[in-house]
Amino acid sequence: MNADNPSVPGAAASRPWWKVVLLLLGGFLLFMLLYGLLQSAFFLTDGRSVLNVAAGFICGAAILAVYSLMVRLFERRRPADMPARRFLPDIGGGFLLSIVYFAAVTAIIALLGCYAIDSVSFNASVFFPKLAFFFLVACGEEVIFRGVFFRIIDEKWGTAAALAVSALLFGLFHIFNPGATLWSSVAIAIEAGLLLGAAYKFSGNLWLPIGIHWGWNLMEGPVLGFAVSGNGMAPGEAVCLSTVSGPDIISGGAFGLEASIFAAVIGLAIAAWFVHRTARR
């Protein structure tokens, strides 16, 4: 992970507030539309695993390319949050962090008797398309919530406002998912909204939060067998065929591990560490 966070003045800092709001709304609508279209394109390749994998990574890269182009066109500068030299180290570091994070949460709820692995099997034709799909999801959602909302609000109104607003919006974004509750949205805002925003500020780039988000979804669903933000794994889709039981506040219930109190507490602790390290610089 990179601890460098170059302070590069953005176009939003010198613009009137109403123009910044228009920039936020325009960016949100553009990338939500693009994200939806690219997800549809990905699902058109279902059943053809090699093409499916390629489609996931190509669609994820397409979102990043359009983001880079939009920054150049509308802000008249290179995107400072996409340094090529940090791509592999920070995506890899974020991915590894998520594996450790979700392994720790799963171990806790397993010790409490709320999670058990019944059997283990690996199907490459199912796993690798999921790997590619969640790369697309990570790229799309991180561009929208960190590249657009967090970055622009941070440039105009400061980091505290950027963390609060982007986390709140990220929680609201998931409130209509299957199995969602008010608590699951609050938990997502805490453990993902704050954590991913703090990781973006700490690293100064999109790669670290993309890596965290990517590894998070992959570990939660296709590896451990939990629902991912309410979207359950069908039999045979996850490496671990598991049984989840007990109180929803512990296990996460139908929404998945993200709605566990332990995921929220540990995620908040990691976010606080990123904020502390950033503030020390």
How does the language model describe each region?
Residues 17, 49, 87-88, 123-124, ...:
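Membrane-helix interface segments
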Residues 21-25, 54, 91-96, 127-128, ...:
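Hydrophobic alpha-helical transmembrane segments
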Residues 54-65, 127-132, 140, 187-194, ...:
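Membrane-embedded alpha-helical segments of multi-pass membrane proteins
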Residues 10-11, 140-165, 169, 198-205:
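Membrane-interface helix/loop boundary segments of multi-pass membrane proteins
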Residues 8, 37-55, 72-143, 150-155:
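Juxtamembrane helix-loop-helix connectors linking adjacent transmembrane helices
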Residues 1-78, 221-281:
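N-terminal, membrane-interfacial amphipathic/helix-forming hydrophobic leader that caps
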Residues 185-249:
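Functionally important transmembrane alpha-helices
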Residues 103, 134, 138, 158-175, ...:
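Small-polar-interrupted transmembrane alpha-helices in polytopic inner-membrane proteins
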